[in-house]
């Protein structure tokens, strides 16, 4: 699963997602992409599950690019623990996502096959998404 090698702080504040995405909003590598239409946080497990669903559908052809990286730590307190006594320990990583952010790109396969693969990946994600095609000049 995806995780950063080194971070400046072990625990971060949750923060808040506001407004549309300003970067990562255009297709850079592939021909067809999956774009987020709402705010949310994708965990590394969700990102990996969507990748596996796509790869199983397109088999050996084509290339897939993951355009988000989980670099925000998620903390949790143990079960049956009273509140207080500090912040919980890190349990995983997530990628904050804003509307308009490109999540995955595919190239090298039939558009219909790629579209079906992206639909399968979208079912694994907690945010609403749309499929977009690269504009030809």
From Swiss-Prot:
<keyword id="KW-0694">RNA-binding</keyword>
<dbReference type="GO" id="GO:0022625">
    <property type="term" value="C:cytosolic large ribosomal subunit"/>
</dbReference>
<dbReference type="GO" id="GO:0006412">
    <property type="term" value="P:translation"/>
</dbReference>
<dbReference type="GO" id="GO:0003735">
    <property type="term" value="F:structural constituent of ribosome"/>
</dbReference>
<protein>
    <recommendedName>
        <fullName>Large ribosomal subunit protein uL16</fullName>
    </recommendedName>
</protein>
<comment type="function">
    <text>Binds 23S rRNA and is also seen to make contacts with the A and possibly P site tRNAs.</text>
</comment>
<keyword id="KW-0699">rRNA-binding</keyword>
<dbReference type="InterPro" id="IPR036920">
    <property type="entry name" value="Ribosomal_uL16_sf"/>
</dbReference>
<dbReference type="Pfam" id="PF00252">
    <property type="entry name" value="Ribosomal_L16"/>
</dbReference>
<dbReference type="GO" id="GO:0000049">
    <property type="term" value="F:tRNA binding"/>
</dbReference>
<keyword id="KW-0820">tRNA-binding</keyword>
<dbReference type="InterPro" id="IPR016180">
    <property type="entry name" value="Ribosomal_uL16_dom"/>
</dbReference>
<comment type="similarity">
    <text>Belongs to the universal ribosomal protein uL16 family.</text>
</comment>
<keyword id="KW-0687">Ribonucleoprotein</keyword>
<dbReference type="InterPro" id="IPR047873">
    <property type="entry name" value="Ribosomal_uL16"/>
</dbReference>
<keyword id="KW-0689">Ribosomal protein</keyword>
<comment type="subunit">
    <text>Part of the 50S ribosomal subunit.</text>
</comment>
<dbReference type="InterPro" id="IPR020798">
    <property type="entry name" value="Ribosomal_uL16_CS"/>
</dbReference>
<dbReference type="GO" id="GO:0019843">
    <property type="term" value="F:rRNA binding"/>
</dbReference>
<dbReference type="InterPro" id="IPR000114">
    <property type="entry name" value="Ribosomal_uL16_bact-type"/>
</dbReference>
């Amino acid at each position: 699963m995806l995780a950063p090698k080194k971070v400046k702080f072990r625990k971060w504040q949750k923060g808040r997602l506001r407004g549309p995405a300003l970067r990562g909003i255009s297709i850079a590598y592939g021909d067809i992409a999956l774009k987020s239409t709402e705010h949310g946080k994708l965990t590394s497990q969700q990102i990996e599950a969507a990748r596996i669903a796509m790869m199983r559908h397109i088999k050996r052809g084509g290339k897939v690019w993951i355009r988000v990286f989980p670099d925000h730590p998620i903390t949790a307190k143990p079960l049956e623990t009273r509140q207080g006594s500090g912040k919980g320990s890190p349990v995983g990583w997530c990628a904050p996502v804003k509307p308009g952010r490109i999540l995955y790109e595919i190239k090298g396969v039939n558009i219909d096959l790629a579209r079906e693969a992206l639909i399968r990946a979208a079912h694994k994600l907690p945010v609403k998404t749309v499929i977009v095609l690269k504009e030809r000049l």
